[in-house]
């Protein structure tokens, strides 16, 4: 647990990237070994690469990175096989993450991209021209036809997450709940 806490504290400092233009420690790799979990999307890869670089070059840590899909990496983190992840979309795994946070097994260190949201978006010009102000407006047939599905022109099409990602499944449920699954 102490090692996990030390790693968590290092990660907190690492998140303030601007401070690390020169090495801040004379610690050797023997003093610091960190196993980072990385995911299969670009922004996570960037965050992991920056964090790994800082830990290796700024702290002299021995860094191992394991890349994989969300569920296996989270399972390894929860099982203490991985020390830290630098990006996670917690809304997609609330049932898995919240109990681990509550038990103290995982520590949330902060948000690295505060403006990131998961939502349905329409550009301003289209929104203003057709008075689209909420997701419910997308259920109107005349609005749905603005976003025709080229494979089925009788229906509208929304762009979602990559098939296989948790957010894809979440969005399927949302579409059904909003009454958008048959449009």
Model-identified regions with their sequence ranges:
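Short helix-initiation/N-cap motifs at beta->coil->alpha
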Residues: 41-42, 62-76, 182-183
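Pocket-flanking alpha-helical
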Residues: 48, 68-104
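Sec/Tat signal peptide C-region and signal peptidase I cleavage site
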Residues: 22-29
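A conserved helix-loop-strand patch within extracytoplasmic ligand-binding domains
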Residues: 105-160
């Amino acid at each position: 647990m102490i090692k996990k806490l030390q790693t968590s504290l290092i990660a907190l400092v690492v998140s303030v990237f601007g401070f690390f233009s020169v090495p801040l420690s004379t610690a050797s790799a023997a003093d610091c070994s960190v196993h980072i979990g990385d995911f299969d999307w670009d922004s996570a890869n960037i965050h992991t690469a920056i964090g790994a670089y800082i830990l290796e070059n700024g702290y002299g840590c021995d860094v191992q990175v394991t890349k994989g899909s969300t569920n296996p990496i989270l399972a390894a983190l929860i099982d203490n096989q991985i020390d830290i992840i630098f990006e996670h979309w917690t809304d997609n795994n609330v049932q898995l993450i919240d109990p681990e946070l509550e038990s103290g097994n995982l520590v949330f260190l902060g948000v690295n991209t505060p403006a990131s949201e998961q939502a349905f978006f329409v550009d301003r010009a289209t929104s203003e021209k057709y008075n689209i102000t909420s997701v419910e407006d997308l259920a109107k047939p005349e609005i749905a036809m603005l976003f025709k599905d080229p494979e089925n022109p009788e229906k509208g099409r929304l762009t979602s997450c990559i098939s296989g990602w948790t957010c894809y499944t979440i969005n399927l449920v949302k579409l059904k709940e909003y009454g958008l699954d048959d449009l």
